[in-house]
C-alpha cells in the first residue's frame, strides 16, 4: 500500500486543544462579574485558569476516555484512563490479529515510527493498540502478534470485554457514520490518534502516512 501524500497528511494532522472551547468558557465564567465596579479588562487569575483547565480536562475524561478494564499481551490487568492515558503522551489505534486488510501495513508503518522515536517510546510516549476482536485475541494471541511484527518495548497490545472495547472505540471516535460499514470490522478505520492528555492536545493521522511525518508530529506533542 503506498504512503499517503504529504499534503494530505499535513491537512489531517492539525493540532488543537481537544477542549479549547471548554477552557475558554470556564475561564470566562470564572472571571465575569456583573458588579459596576468590576474591571472588565482584568486578566483571569492563576487559580481561575487552573480551575478552568481542570474542569475541561475532567469533561474530556468523562466523555472520551472511559476507564475500562483491559489486559495487555503479558496478561497484565490495566485501566484505560488511570494506567494507560492519565498524565501521558500516547498513540491509540485499533486492529485485530487475523486482519488481512489495513492492519499489517499500519502495524509495519508504526514499527518504523517506533524505531524513529527510539528510547522515547516507553519513557516520553506510550503506544497502545486495541483489538477489535477480543473474542479471538487474548493475551497469547497478542503476544504472538507482537513477536511476529517486531513490536518493541513501550507499545502495548490490549484486549478486554467486547462491550468495553466497543465503548472505547466509539468514545475515541474510530467510527464511520454509515452503520453498515461501521459494523464491518474488516473495513475498520486505520487512523492513529495521538495526544498529550494533561495538556488536552489531541489529533489524528492516517496510519499509512509517511513514518517520518508521523514521528515528527508526535514529537511536537511531546515537546508541547
Identify the function of each model-found stretch.
Residues 1-17:
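N-terminal secretory signal peptides and thylakoid transit peptides that target proteins
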Residues 31-67:
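N-proximal helix/coil linker or "cap" segments that precede and/or mark the start of modular domains
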Residues 69-89:
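A short beta-strand-turn-helix
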Residues 82-102, 110:
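Short active-site neighborhood of thiol/selenol oxidoreductases, capturing the structured segment around
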Residues 107-128:
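Conserved helix-turn-beta segment immediately C-terminal to the redox Cys motif
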Residues 124-136, 154-163:
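Thiol-based oxidoreductase modules, predominantly thioredoxin-like and allied folds used
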Residues 144-189:
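Short, internal strand/loop/helix patches
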Residues 182-224:
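Thiol-/selenol-based redox modules, centered on thioredoxin-like
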